């Protein structure tokens, strides 16, 4: 799908979320505290059956930001694993090859396709990496990630601009990858 086809399908109305939505992220520490208190009330059925789930944190976050999710998935019988990149610095061109390597390695270890769970930019990376190694991915779960497009349509676009990262270049490569549709469920 090229840019013209993308705009024909989705229009020009896609843009960054409002700043007020980004400010909602400030509630994260309070939400984490509520989760810690309510932890024992969460469902605990063994539904994962040892399936591997690769966790990808959002922009500006490290693997430790996914600790609650990892513990919960493990308690459900999944084998949740952190990505090897550590801190998500937002440089998609550098992170994407590492995510692809992680997917291949964990899929090979599991001898089966794995699931990907990405938060924000981590969800974008999960989605785009899955295009490259579809045979290694059984499902993609995203939390607060754009379903179409890339960082250009997120609240962190301004941070990309400040850091001098070219969101148009990232967007153009995303549109080029649309030529290869994702076949696993998202």
What are these regions (language model features)?
Residues 1-53, 76, 109, 156:
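Flexible, membrane-associating and regulatory peripheral segments of lipid-active enzymes
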Residues 53-64, 68, 74-183:
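Serine-dependent carboxylesterase/thioesterase catalytic core
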């Amino acid at each position: 799908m090229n840019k013209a086809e993308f705009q024909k399908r989705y229009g020009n109305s896609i843009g960054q979320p409002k700043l007020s939505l980004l400010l909602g992220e400030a509630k994260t520490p309070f939400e984490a505290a509520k989760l810690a208190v309510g932890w024992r009330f969460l469902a605990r059925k063994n539904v994962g059956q040892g399936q591997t789930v690769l966790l990808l944190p959002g922009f500006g976050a490290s693997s430790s930001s996914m600790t609650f999710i990892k513990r919960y998935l493990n308690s459900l019988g999944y084998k949740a694993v952190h990505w090897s990149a550590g801190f998500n610095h937002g440089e998609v061109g550098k992170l994407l090859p590492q995510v692809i390597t992680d997917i291949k390695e964990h899929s090979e270890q599991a001898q089966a396709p794995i699931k990907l769970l990405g938060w924000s930019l981590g969800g974008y990376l999960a989605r785009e990496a899955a295009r490259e190694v579809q045979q290694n991915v059984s499902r993609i779960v995203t939390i607060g990630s754009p379903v179409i497009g890339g960082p250009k349509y997120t609240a962190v676009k301004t941070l990309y601009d400040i850091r001098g990262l070219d969101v148009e270049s990232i967007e153009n490569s995303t549109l080029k990858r649309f030529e290869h549709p994702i076949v696993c469920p998202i």
